[in-house]
């Protein structure tokens, strides 16, 4: 018996880690970085704020970072849209920071420019008449300016894109 291995139980500092995330979108008017009051009262924004408050108060949770990712719809000059997305990320961060005053959390704002990937996803999921043609244009051209021009040439469809798809891409994603 003397040669038998044995185990000693000792205290440890193991803490179970779980990652939880919440999301919300703040939408903007075309060419504007101004956060409208009605956007901050939307249910998804209120739920996001409640999520942050609840998790920041929990003893078993270490709060991460609240990211404000600014995007622009892919209509208009690319340089303008890059600056606009940066302004949107900053205004979205400022707005959510004001609503979450007193909560110890880090913030990070980043600009992502024109959201062609989001555009592709929304078009693919839509019931727009010429969606296959639009998706083909996206795969044929790498240039943002060329993509935009070719899609605008589909004038009947472009009006539908302006009302159904593009407004969803003008956002700060939290």
What are these regions (language model features)?
Residues 16-20, 36-40, 58-60, 76, ...:
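Extracytoplasmic/periplasmic, Sec-exported soluble proteins
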Residues 1-22:
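Short beta-strand elements
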Residues 41-45, 83-85, 101, 124-126:
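General N-terminal targeting signals
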Residues 3-8, 44-49, 87-91, 150-155:
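A short linear-motif detector with a strong N-terminal bias
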Residues 18, 23-30, 61-63, 102-174:
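Periplasmic OmpA/Pal-like peptidoglycan-binding modules at the C-termini of bacterial envelope proteins
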Residues 74-84, 90, 105-108, 112-116:
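Active-site neighborhood of thiol-dependent amide/isopeptide-bond enzymes
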Residues 7-10, 28, 33-69, 73-74, ...:
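Periplasmic peptidoglycan-binding/anchoring modules of Gram-negative envelope and division proteins
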Residues 68, 83-100, 174:
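Cysteine-centered nucleophilic/redox motifs
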């Amino acid at each position: 018996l003397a040669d038998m291995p044995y185990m000693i139980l000792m205290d440890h500092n193991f803490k179970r880690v779980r990652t939880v995330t919440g999301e919300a979108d703040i939408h903007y008017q075309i060419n504007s970085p101004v956060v409208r009051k009605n956007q901050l009262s939307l249910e998804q924004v209120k739920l996001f704020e409640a999520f942050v408050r609840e998790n920041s108060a929990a003893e078993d949770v270490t709060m991460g970072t609240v990211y404000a990712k600014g995007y622009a719809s892919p209509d208009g000059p690319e340089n303008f849209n890059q600056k606009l997305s940066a302004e949107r990320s900053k205004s979205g961060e400022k707005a959510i920071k004001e609503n979450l005053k007193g909560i110890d959390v880090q913030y990070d704002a980043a600009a992502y420019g024109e959201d062609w990937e989001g555009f592709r996803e929304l078009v693919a999921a839509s019931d727009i008449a010429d969606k296959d043609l639009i998706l083909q244009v996206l795969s044929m051209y790498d240039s943002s300016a060329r993509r935009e021009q070719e899609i605008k040439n589909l004038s009947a469809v472009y009006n539908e894109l302006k009302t159904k798809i593009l407004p969803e891409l003008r956002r700060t994603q939290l």
